[in-house]
Structure formats: structure tokens, C-alpha cells
Regions:
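Short, acidic/polar
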Residues: 89-99, 114-119, 148-154
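Short catalytic-loop micro-motif centered on adjacent basic/acidic residues
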Residues: 108-112, 170-173
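Histidine-centered catalytic micro-motifs
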Residues: 49-60, 197-206
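Histidine-rich, glycine-flanked metal-binding segment
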Residues: 2-4, 9-47
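Active-site gating loops and adjacent loop-to-helix segments of metal-dependent hydrolytic enzymes
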Residues: 61-93, 100, 127-142, 147, ...
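Metal-coordinating catalytic core of metallo-dependent amide/deamination hydrolases
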Residues: 120-207
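Divalent metal-coordination and catalytic microenvironments
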Residues: 8, 22, 43, 54, ...
Length: 207
């Protein structure tokens, strides 16, 4: 597939952009090249694609649900109970919708943390964009939960580390109020050992 965008604004200059096989081949004024598809970019600007640095993509499924309430009431009374009924297939379709919306708005990479992360990873693979997907790590300050969560994250890393070149596995400790200090240190060390990204919720709202 090759594409030629004509007369587009790039770095405050009007130019053409030629792309082929998923890569930019040349940028310049009045390019004399042929392409399978040509677009007129007059009045438009060419920008690098955007990065969504933190998302729960499958929560597109809950858009409009339980709006305008305090964070912890929203989490404990509304979101966590409904999330308990989610399946991997539901997460896949919610994430697919999010991927389509991101593509439409110019985002080609997302950093995601959510339940049933296998579904999100499949959605990324099928959508064509890139991303890091983290399994949610919550131990609620309980030692037995912590042991279970560590084992689950280790297993997910081993299972998904070679899933797809565009999709990488990351670590997602939920927050300092749902993950013990000991588990946070374990996440830090595990991520450093395997060169993984970490995302966490900080300074969200007053309790």
C-alpha cells in the first residue's frame, strides 16, 4: 500500500508526504512520485501520531454509567461490582471500540491497565496500533492476595512477553491505597529485572 498526501502543512511549510509499506519514504514540495492512493491535504496539518499514556480501554463499555459521583463511591459501589461480571470477550470488544476511536483521533499507541488483559492485547493486535498492556495488581494489603497476585503477574509475563511485536506486557499496581508497600517494591524489582513499564494511579482525589 502506498499513499501520497499533497499540499499538507508540515513544520509550517506546505509539502507532500509519500508513504509506502507502512513507512514514510519522502517529504518535500511537489514530490514527483506515484502512489496507489492520493489525498489532498490542503488546509490540513500533518502531525506525529499521539500516545495515550494511561487508559482502561475496555471501559468504553461503561460510558455514561454512574456519572458525577465521588471517586470512591464510583469505584466501590458502581464500577468494581459491574467489573466483576466482565469476561475476556467483553473486554476485547470494549478495547476494539477504544482502538477505533484512538485511530480516528490520531493516537497509535496506548498504555493500558485493565482486567482480562488478554482481551485487550488481542484487540491491539487486531486493530493495528501499538500498546503496552498491564494486568491489574491489587492485594488490598493482604499477604495471601499479594502472593496470588505476584504469581499471576509472573505467569502473565511469561505467557504474553512474545505475544506480538506491537504489543508489550507491563506492570499495573492499581494504587497506593489498594497495593501494599511490599508488593509495590516487588513490582518495582520485577519490572526492573525484565525491563517492563509500570503505571499506577496517584493523587486521584481526596478520600
Amino acid at each position: 500500500m502506498s499513499l501520497l498526501i499533497k499540499n499538507v502543512s508540515f513544520n509550517e511549510k506546505t509539502c507532500d508526504i509519500h508513504m509506502a509499506n507502512g513507512l514514510i519514504q519522502s517529504i518535500g514540495p511537489d514530490l514527483q512520485v506515484t502512489a496507489e492512493r492520493t489525498l489532498d491535504g490542503q488546509g490540513l496539518a500533518a502531525l506525529p501520531s499521539f500516545i495515550n499514556t494511561h487508559t482502561h480501554s475496555a471501559m468504553t463499555l461503561f460510558r455514561g454509567y454512574a456519572d458525577d459521583i465521588a471517586l470512591f463511591d464510583w469505584l466501590e459501589k458502581k464500577i468494581w461490582p459491574i467489573e466483576a461480571g466482565l469476561t475476556e470477550e467483553a473486554v476485547y470488544w470494549g478495547a476494539r471500540l477504544a482502538c477505533l476511536e484512538m485511530i480516528k483521533s490520531g493516537a497509535t499507541y496506548m498504555n493500558d491497565m485493565y482486567w482480562h488483559h488478554h482481551g485487550t492485547m488481542r484487540a491491539l493486535k487486531d486493530s493495528g496500533i501499538r500498546g503496552t498492556v498491564s494486568a491489574v495488581f491489587l492485594d488490598h494489603m493482604n499477604a495471601d492476595n499479594a502472593k496470588e497476585q505476584r504469581a499471576a503477574n509472573e505467569a502473565s509475563f511469561l505467557e504474553m512477553k512474545d505475544f506480538h511485536p506491537r504489543v508489550t506486557f507491563g506492570m499495573g499496581p492499581h494504587a497506593i491505597y489498594t497495593v501494599s508497600p511490599e508488593s509495590l517494591m516487588w513490582v518495582k524489582e520485577f519490572a526492573a529485572e525484565h525491563d517492563l513499564k509500570i503505571q499506577i494511579h496517584c493523587s486521584e482525589a481526596e478520600r
